[in-house]
Amino acid sequence: MNAKHFTQVNMETLDAVACLASELGVVPSDFSYAGIKDKKAVTSQTMVVKDVTINRLKAIQSSIQNKDLKIYNLRPATRHLQIGQLKGNHFSIIIRNVSKCLEDDPEASLTERVFDAIEKIKEKGFVNYYGPQRFGLGQNVQTDQIGLALLKQNLVKALHLFFTPEEGNDAVNKAKRHFIHTEDAKATLALMPEYKTRERLVLRALNRYGNGHEGCTRAWLSLPHNMRILYIHSYCSKIWNEAASFRLKTYGMNVVEGDLVSCDRLEQDDSSQNNHVHVVTAKDVESSTYSIDQVVLPMPGYSVRYPCNKLSSWYQEALVQDGLEMSRFRIPALQLNVPGCYRALLARPHELVYRWLGGEEVLCAKEDFAIGESKLLPKTGGALSLSFSLNSSSYATVCLREIMKCSV
């Protein structure tokens, strides 16, 4: 096995892995990594690939650079990486054209307003919501809807949701529209662009095994496990976000009887099923034993505990409303088991550094900005430079949304 650092530009991790696998003549499951990176960014991470020499990796460096991928820091590895096997992520961000909101204090300067918002986040943290990228960019169908259909073991419906097109006549949506209208997997495969790895894997399986229940099962199984489980996690993330909003609306920032608190450090997300949690007692509340920073909420699954207060019935009602029972988080046909995990209610940025660029010219990221190349963009408004770290699975977009008080 060999490890490498890996940079991708405007590309999903899973599509990048598929591209590398194709170049190396291996399968995507030969790669292991600690997390899925955002598409709309220049991202770097460590990966491990088995049964591939360093020389083979060096040989593809020039060809993949044309596909917005770079590999570097090649070295031998002795073990695979696991999802969640990282402390967190570091972000470097420039926000351009910063201006005051209409409701802002007219006496406060823009710099004062911005720095005050950042310091509040630094001091109090922010609600640890899953960011919008967890649910996909689709307007007609989002990934949590596909995940719910999979959990209900309606694999045919899930596949139709998977191929539901968005507005527009680009090649991808034309191909999806053709499949929805004809269910002709072979013809759709010819229309689907090469870079749409997931769609092409599914279409190949449908072309071979048919569009019935058995064919749809094999089509879902044609996707690597990490791809299949993402849809389930997306649905569970939606439930967690809604639970967090209900928790804060009902109890605010107070620790209350029946809350779950973590007795371990929560530095991981989807691999943290076994964190020790404690149910807060009346005595704990009276003595202020725990802080709001220790409160966790469960991601639904078959092995998690649920809070012993109004949140318990909320979870039950939410899952029943979606046609699920508490224990139905196993899908044998797709080899998917979802034990659940615990996620901190609040997150805090650390190693936070910020700087107001003001009248300076602002660095504009190019496709290869991550390795030191950049160009200057003339200033058209105030700009803020931010760098900070977040624990695994906390979202920079959510942190920025709280600072900016608008969608990111």
Identify the role of each PLM range:
Residues M1-V408:
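Non-catalytic, substrate/partner-engaging modules appended to enzymatic cores
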